[in-house]
């Protein structure tokens, strides 16, 4: 069993935190975020840190308070540093381009895929085969990166498709004659 929830989340200088009921709000140099903690978890802000504890001694409460602590730590990291996911596009003729608030992807289909960039997310295309997804909400950054990857996941034979830059693609050998 993990003991992640026992450590308090320290709030660095330059970040203001407030706890109102079950809602934790963080405001920092990059923006502001909030997270609603489950009712089975107690949340307190004292001595410059946020502490979480299970309200009951149930397995569900034990699991939820570790999750709540990790989510609050992500709020702090998001409003101070932010989050970034890098995607790589591999394949002949596969490329990406920005058109205002839309991402245009040429992924081998008969048409280009147009992806509307959601609010709070910044996408940059340093090269036609690289996409950087940046934002302060880790959930949103991961979701956007996963949605872009899902348009053409990497295939195991040639490795063509959209993949995370740190992802390893298990390659298969083709059929033998």
Swiss-Prot record:
Cited Gene3D superfamilies: Ribosomal protein L6, alpha-beta domain
Pfam families: Ribosomal_L6
Membrane-spanning residues: none
Record GO cellular component, one term: cytosolic large ribosomal subunit
One biological process term in Gene Ontology: cytoplasmic translation
GO molecular function, one term: rRNA binding
Complex formation: Part of the 50S ribosomal subunit.
Protein's recorded name: Large ribosomal subunit protein uL6
Native source organism of the sequence: Rhodopseudomonas palustris (strain HaA2)
């Amino acid at each position: 069993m993990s003991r992640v929830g026992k450590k308090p989340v320290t709030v660095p200088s330059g970040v203001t935190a407030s706890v109102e009921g079950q809602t934790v709000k963080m405001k920092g140099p990059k923006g502001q975020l909030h997270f609603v903690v489950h009712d089975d978890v107690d949340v307190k802000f004292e001595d410059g840190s946020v502490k979480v504890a299970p309200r009951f001694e149930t397995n569900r409460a034990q699991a939820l308070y570790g999750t709540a602590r990790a989510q609050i730590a992500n709020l702090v990291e998001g409003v101070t540093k932010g989050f970034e996911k890098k995607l790589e596009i591999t394949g002949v003729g596969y490329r990406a381009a920005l058109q205002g608030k839309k991402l245009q992807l040429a992924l081998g289909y008969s048409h280009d895929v147009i992806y509307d960039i959601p609010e709070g997310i910044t996408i940059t295309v340093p090269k036609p085969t690289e996409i950087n997804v940046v934002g302060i909400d880790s959930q949103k950054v991961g979701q956007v990166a996963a949605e872009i990857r899902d348009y053409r996941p990497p295939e195991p034979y040639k490795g063509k498709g959209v993949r995370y830059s740190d992802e390893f693609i298990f390659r298969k050998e083709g059929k033998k004659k």
